[in-house]
Amino acid sequence: MEILYTEITQDLTEGLLEIALEELEKNRKVYYIVPSSMSFEKEKEILERLAKGSDTAVFYLLVTRFKQLPYYFDKREKATMKTELGTVGLSMLFRRILRSFKKDEIPLYFSLQDSAGFLEMLIQLRAELLTANLSVENLPDNPKNQELKKILTTFEAELSVEYANYSEFGDFTNRLADGEFDQQLKDVTIIIDGYTRFSAEEELFIESIQEKVARFVVGTYSDENSLTAGSETIYVGTSQMITRFRNKYPVELRKIASSSVNEVYSKLTRMLDLDSRFVITDEKIELKAEDEKYFRIWEAENQKVEIERVAKEIRQKISQGAFFKDFTVLVGDPAAYEITLKEIFDLYEIPFFYAQEESMSQHPLVIFFESLFAIKKNNYRTDDVVNLLKSKVYTDVNLDEEVIDYFEYYVQKYKISGRKKFTEEFIESEFSQIELVNEMREKLLGSESPLQVFLGNNRQKTGKKWVSDLQALLENGNVMANMNAYFSAAELQNEHQMADKHEQVWQMLISTLNEFFAVFSDEKLKSVEFLDILLAGLKNAKYRQIPANVDVVNVKDYELVEPKTNNYIYAIGLSQTNFPRIKKNSTLLSDEERLEINQTTDENQFIEQLNVANYQKNQFTVLSLINSAKESLVLSMPQIMTNEQGEFSPVFQLFLKDADEKILQKIQGVNLFESLEHIGNSRSVIAMIGQIERELVESEETNEDKRVFWSSIFRILVKSNADFQKILLDLAKDIDTVNLAPDTLEQIYGDKIYASVSSFERFYNCEYQYFLENTLSLETFENIDINSKIVGNFFHEVFEKVMKETDLSAENFDEKLTLFLQEVDKNYSRYFTQDATARFTWSNLEEIVRQTATVLKATVSTDELKTLLTESSFGLSKSELGNFSVDDIYLRGRIDRLDQLSTDYLGVIDYKSSAHSFKLQEAYDGLSLQFMTYLDVIKQAFPNQKIWGALYLQFKNQPINLSEINQLSEIANILKESMRYDGLVLEDAAEQIKGIENIALKNTNSYNEEEFEQLLKLNEEHYRAAGQRLKNGKIAINPIMKRSEGIDQSGNVRGCRYCPLKSICRFEANIHMNEHSREIGQKSQAEILAELKGEGRDE
C-alpha cells in the first residue's frame, strides 16, 4: 500500500494522475476511485486533464466508486426469480413486519408502524449496520434496542428467504478474501482520491484487496505536523486514518509537492490551522488589499441582490473570454436559494446545472395519486376532486379543458362535497353548462366510472387484487393514454428533459407496484392503506439529474465542495446558522450508544460517532472550500435570509480580523457609485433600469457622470431592443382601458340601461369593478358567513313574514317570530349544511334574529310608526311601487320596509348585516345612492304624501364585556342602546321621530325640504353622469381614494379594500394611485350643503 499525501493548498489529483499514466504505460488497468458525491464531475475533470483540456475517453482507466467495483469483476448472471427490493420496497417490508407485531411485543414502536419517518429511520439504521460490518446483536442492550432487535431480526429473516436482497459489495469483499479474483487482479492498479476517512465496510474491502493488486495507492490531504500532533490539527481525520493503516499494513508513505501554490489560500489555511489548534502565536497573518484579486467576502443586502451580483460578474467574465463551465456556485441552503437563483440566472441568460435533487411530488401523476388517496380518506372533499381532475391524468381523452373549469365553478359555487353528491346528478338547472358538467361527472365520477369501480367500497382486498384493480383504473381512466400523450408531446416539442421526467415517473410507478406486489401480494388491505403505501414511495422519489450541456455553471450545496474545484468559486448564503452546518443526531442510535458499540466490537467493525464525524467533516469542508478556487474565491452572506437577520459566521470573523477593508465588500442592489458592475446583459439591465432611475431621482448628490453613463446605456437599449421600446411606450399606459366600440355598446346596453341601485354604488367605487361585475356578469364564489347574501336573504325573509302579519302585536310577537324562524330555517337548511363555516354561521343566526327582533317588537308596540309594506319592489315585473327611471336608466330594487308615521308621513327602513349610517359626503361622492333613490321612489309612487326620511337597522347580536359592567341588570339597557335605527330625517318630522323609541337621530342628518329636494336632484345627477359614461363606452380603472387615508396596511386604497378583482385590473396603489384613482372626501358637510343651497355642484 502506498499513501500519498499533500497539503490541501496543493494539487493532489495531479500527482495521482502521474501515477495513473505510469500504470497505463505498463498496460495495467487503472480503477480510479472517488467519492460518490463527486464521481461525475471528477470523471470529467480526470479525462480532460489526461487529454490536456479536450473531451476524451481512456479505455483502460475507469473513474468509479467503491460500490461499482463488483460489476467490473463479477460477470455471473443472477439466476433467481426473486424480487430485489429498493428503498421503497424495503420501507414496505418494514411496514408489513411492524403490522405483524402485537402491542405488548413492541410497546415503544407499535404506534409508529405507518409512520414514514420511522420507516425511513429503520432503513437508515439497517444501512448503517451493513456499512459498519455490524449486526443487530451488536446493539447495546436496553428496552428500545430490544424492540429494534426484534424488528430487524424478523425483517432480515423475511428478506433473506423471500427476496433477492444482499450486499453485493460485502459478498465481493468476502470472495476477494477467498482468492476468487486473484488472477484478474494481477494487472490492476487501484488509486483512491478524495477520501479523508473510510467506513468499516470500505476498510475491510481495502484489507482484502490491497495485497492482491499490482499497485494500491491512497491519495489524501495532510502535513507532517498532523501526522505527529494527534487531534490538534486541521487534518485530524486523515491523520487518524493514516495511523490506523500504518499499524495494519506495510505502508509506503510519501509526500507530494507542487511548485504552484496560491499564497492567499495558504494564508487562509494557516489561519484555520492555528485556530483549530488554539495556538497563541506572535505570527500575524494579514490579508492585504492586493489579495482582493483572489479572495473577497461579501455582505449583501439580501439573497436576490447577492445572486444578481454573482450573475453580473459571471456575464462580465464571459465577455472577457471565460467559459460558463469555469464557474461553480456553492449555496449554504440549496432549497432556499433554488427558485430565486433559477429565475435570476434565466434573466441573465446563464446556463446552469442545479445539483439539488428535485422531488417528483409535483408531477401530475403523483398529484393524481395524492388526490385519489385524499378523496377516499376525506370522503370526496371538493378541492380533492377538483385537484384530481385538474391533474389532467384521469380524464376522457376527448374532454375539453373548459369543461373542467365549468365543473370546478359548479362544485365550488354550490358547495358539492361527499361521495353521494358527486355520484348523483347535479340539479342546479339555472347553471348554463349543467349538461356538459353532468356528462363529465357521470363519465369520471358516476357510479359506473373507473374511479368508482376502484374506490367504490371499503372491503379489504389482497395486494395482488389491488394491483390488478389499479391497472384497470389506469387503462379505463385513460391514465396510461394521457401519460403517453404527455411524453410524445414533450418529445415533439424537443423538451427532452420534460419527456425524461414523464418517463422516470412512470417507471417509478411500475417499480413501486412491482415491489408492492412482492411484499403485500397476499396481505389484505383497505383502499386507503393501499394508496397510502403506494403514495409513500412516489412522494419521496427524486428525479435522476444529468447536465444537459457541458458548458454550464455548476450550482450545488457547499458541503459537496472539494479542493481545486474550479477557476471561479462563489459560495453564497453562508451565515452563522449554516457555515459550518450543525447537524443533530436524529437516528435511532444515540452518540452514547455508538461509542459503546465501538468499544466492544472487533477490528473492521465500527459505526460512525456522528458528533465526532460531523465536527471533522465540517472542519474539512471549510478547509476544502477556501481551497476550492484556482483563480478567485468569494464567500458571501446576505444580511436578510429567510426573513431573519444574518450574522457573520465565526469563519468570516476569523478571516476579517486582520484583513484590509477591501476584502469585505458591501453588495447593494443599485449603487450609484458603481456603474459597469451593474452591467450583466441587456435583459437584466432593462429589468433594473427603473430602480436605477429612482435612485438617480432620489439621490441628494448631483452626480452628473453617473447620470450621463446611465442615460447612454438607456439610449443604447432603446435603439437596439425593439421589445424594450414597446415596454417604454406601454409603461405609462400599463392599466389604461380602451373605450368600448359602438357596436359592442349596442349589444350590451342597447337604448336603455337596466341595473340595480347597488350596482351604481359599485360604479362610483370603481368604474372597472362595475364593468366586470355588472356588464360582464363576473361572479366570485361566495362563502356562507355572516356577511353573505344568503344570510341577508335569510334575515329579510324572517322579518318580512313577521311584519306582514295583520294581527301582529307585542303580545304575540315572540310566538310569530318563532313560527316563521322555524319555517325559514327549514327552507334555507340546504345552504347552511354545505360546509363547516356555513354550519357555524347557521348556529348563530337565531340569536341575531332574536336580538334584532327586540327593536321590531318595540316598533310594533308603538302607534307612532306603522309598517305599510314589506319587501316592496320597484323596476321589476309586478312591482308594488312601479317603475323608476332617470332618463334612459331603469333602476330596480327592493325596499325592506315602508313605514308611516301617525301624521301620515312616509319613510323607508333598510335592513343591513353590517354597520351603516347615512353620510352626506358619501352621498355627494356617489357612494351612497340607496337611501335617496328609495325616497325618490316612494315620492313618485305616493305623490300626495310627505316624506319623513330613511333609517338603517343592523342585524347583530351585540357582544358585551362583562368586566365592564357593575350589575347584570345593566345588560338589558346596554343591548337596548346598541340596537337602534340610524339614518336621515326631514326637519318637519324630526320632533315626532325623536319621540319614538330606538331611533338615534343626529342633528347633522336632519334636512329641510329644500335640502332634501337638492339631494334628490344630486342623486339623479349621479345616475345621469354614470349612464352617460357607460353609453360613451368609457370605463376607467379608478378606485376611490381618500387623501387622508392614503394606502392601508394591506397596500390598498379604499376602493380596492374588499375588491376580489385586483388580479384582473392589476391596479397597484403605490404605482397607480395618483394617476388612476378618484379622490373623494374633498369637501366638508358645510361646503356640500352650501353648494346644494346656492350655485349647484361643481363639475
Swiss-Prot record:
Keyword Metal-binding: yes
UniProt cofactor note: Binds 1 [4Fe-4S] cluster.
GO molecular function term, any single one: double-stranded DNA binding
Keyword Phosphoprotein: no
Biological processes per GO annotation: double-strand break repair via homologous recombination
InterPro entries reported for this sequence: ADDB_N, DNA_helicase_suRexB, P-loop_NTPase, PDDEXK-like_dom_sf, PDDEXK_AddAB-type
Residues the record lists as binding [4Fe-4S] cluster: C766, C1056, C1059, C1065
EC number, as in UniProt: 3.1.-.-
Gene3D superfamilies (UniProt xref): 3.90.320.10, P-loop containing nucleotide triphosphate hydrolases
Enzyme kind, highest EC tier: hydrolase
Residues spanning the signal sequence: none
Keywords of this entry: 4Fe-4S, ATP-binding, DNA damage, DNA repair, DNA-binding, Exonuclease, Helicase, Hydrolase, Iron, Iron-sulfur, Metal-binding, Nuclease, Nucleotide-binding
Cofactor: Mg(2+); [4Fe-4S] cluster
NCBIfam families attached to this UniProt entry: rexB_recomb
Family: Belongs to the helicase family. AddB/RexB type 2 subfamily.
HAMAP family, A to Z: AddB_type2
Record's miscellaneous remark: Despite having helicase-like domains, this subunit does not have helicase activity.
Biological role stated in the UniProt entry: The heterodimer acts as both an ATP-dependent DNA helicase and an ATP-dependent, dual-direction single-stranded exonuclease. Recognizes the chi site generating a DNA molecule suitable for the initiation of homologous recombination. This subunit has 5' -> 3' nuclease activity but not helicase activity.
Description of how the protein assembles with itself and partners: Heterodimer of AddA and RexB.
Protein name: ATP-dependent helicase/deoxyribonuclease subunit B
Gene source species: Lactococcus lactis subsp. cremoris (strain SK11)
Gene: rexB
